[in-house]
Amino acid sequence: MNPRFVILAAALVALCATGLAQTPTTSESSPAIQTPAAMPAALSGGNAPDSIEPASTQASQSRSISFHRDGLWFSAQDGQTHLQVHGYAQADDRMFAANTHGEPLDTFLFRRIRPLFEGTLFNNVDFRFMPDFGQNNPQIQEAFLELKTLPFAKLRVGKFKEPIGLEVLRQDRDLTFVERSLASDLVPLRYIGAQLSGSLLSNIITYEGGYFDGSVDGSNGVFTQWAPGNEAVARGFLQPLAKSHVNAVRQFGVGVGGSEGHQSGSIAGLKTVGQTTFFKYSSTTVADGQHNRLAPQAYYYAGPFGLMGEYVVSSQEVLNKGISGRVRNEAWEATGSVLLTGEKNGYSGVHARNAFEPGRGFDHFGALELALRYSQLRIDGDAFPHFANPATAPRFAEEDGIGFNWYLTRYVKLQTDYEHTGFRMAVPGITPLHSENVLMNQIQLSF
């Protein structure tokens, strides 16, 4: 393993172990560091949706500033306004095997450095501000306000994730693999827009619908100006057995997301899980017309086992030197994982039953997870030769990966993935792109 990763991992483990030796467990915590009673499950490590509720009035009256396991908490005396300051950082080490092209692809980088400022104003308006300083590219990832007067119809305005892809909607710090699959190449990330969302029948049905700045597959929007285009986005998700008395079927969900809109201008290329671009349209090809997406999706979690999958179609009208056409790209992915130490698996992340404290025996070793994933992406044959060069651009890519995750504590997570991506060209007889084989190690520190 790369010495840089070993050194950084050892330093974080030592820091974590020292902190644990000085900090009581949750069940032994003193009242001074208890989370306020009305603190949302999503902020205290539960599997609730990404929403923010006000702190209890009783806790707020006893203190207006507190520091506990979920960050720094500022609360007004009436308990109706509060601010939570926390965040996370991810450091990656990526080693590419059998690189025949000679490029220095091996790298060490800070993938994400994201402080989070979120809370509630006057008991009715949630907010979040999340900048990102990772990859030497400072930007604002999220900034929004959400009016929640009606729990079944919350209005959110700002920059946030478009509700389409299941894998993209999962929080970045809860990912099973270091990077998302090929299927997420066809789904937009965070863009400026307005969204109405809510839940029905005691959270059995959840929905989101919104209107966003025109988005590009696999990319983030910016605040500088509105993109040349716009789109309507909608998603519905059903957990039909969430209230069942049988625990094994409660975490089954199925849904579909999609978008319909107009896009013009440049088209982004497609990247492997190692974040190298493997497909590009011709330099003179531009988006010019309707852009639709459809993404059926599902997950199932039972005890330590978890399965997640989705299928994505992105259909885009394009133009190149007076020739117009429609390109319909498709991708799908399936991810499976098991907690070897028996913890509960879930879409909202994993929490170790016992933190890493080797001095207390093997029962205090954190949580260990083994994961497998397969994904593939197909470029429409109509993209060649007018909109992409068949001699250099592949038509098909498939990825298979194996990952091992170690959750030392609720604050520290180590990930090691080995990913293989192979390609097939659009025209038989053309030498395909060289396969990508990459070993990725990541250390995540959250607070």
Model-derived segments and their meaning:
Residues 18-20, 96, 167, 318:
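N-terminal low-complexity, intrinsically disordered patches enriched in charged
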Residues 5, 16-90, 340, 344-358, ...:
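N-terminal periplasmic/intermembrane-space "pro-region" immediately following the signal or transit peptide
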Residues 1-7:
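Bacterial N-terminal signal peptides that target proteins for export
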Residues 24-25, 33, 58, 99-102, ...:
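Outer-membrane beta-barrel pore domains
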Residues 8-14:
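Hydrophobic helical h-region of N-terminal Sec-dependent signal peptides
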Residues 67-264, 329, 333-362, 367-384:
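Outer membrane beta-barrel
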Residues 22, 26-54, 153, 193-227, ...:
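Glycine/serine-rich loop-strand microenvironments at binding/catalytic pocket rims
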